[in-house]
A protein has these predicted regions:
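Short, well-ordered beta-strand segments in beta-rich or mixed alpha/beta enzyme
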Residues: 1-5, 36-70
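Glycine-rich beta-strand-turn "strand-cap" elements at beta-sheet edges
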Residues: 35-49, 74-111
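Residue-level signal for secondary-structure boundary sites
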Residues: 10, 60-62, 98
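An amphipathic, aromatic/His-enriched active-site/gating alpha helix that lines ligand/cofactor pockets
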Residues: 20-32, 55-92
Length: 111
């Protein structure tokens, strides 16, 4: 889980390349154990907040994506230029109770 914030003026400019190029580029890396990515967005006062959720099967898979220190955030320079601030480190959690979609009950919208 990783948090970032930008201005209202930059929010669409930040989100658009994520949806059209960055997320596809991550998938094309064909990292063993990578299961997908989700992007959440909401207004947060004068800013727009984003939460990126990436799904991996193991810490080894996360390291294959991020490098030896799996908590260092991977933020492309072009994205950094559009952000007001962002977490320097990402947080990793184990899924303890899968969501309803994991049981096939609801589908997440395609990004």
């Amino acid at each position: 889980m990783w948090h970032s914030w930008t201005t209202s003026a930059n929010a669409d400019a930040y989100e658009s390349p994520l949806r059209s190029a960055v997320f596809d580029a991550i998938a094309r890396r064909d990292i063993a154990g990578y299961r997908g990515i989700e992007l959440l967005r909401r207004r947060d006062g004068d800013e727009v907040a984003f939460v990126t959720l990436m799904w991996f099967e193991s810490l080894d898979a996360i390291r294959a994506f991020a490098g030896p220190d799996a908590e260092i955030a991977v933020v492309p320079l072009a994205a950094q230029a559009l952000l007001e601030r962002y977490d320097a480190r990402s947080a990793h959690y184990e899924v303890r109770v899968p969501g309803a979609d994991a049981a096939g009950l609801i589908a997440r919208p395609a990004i």
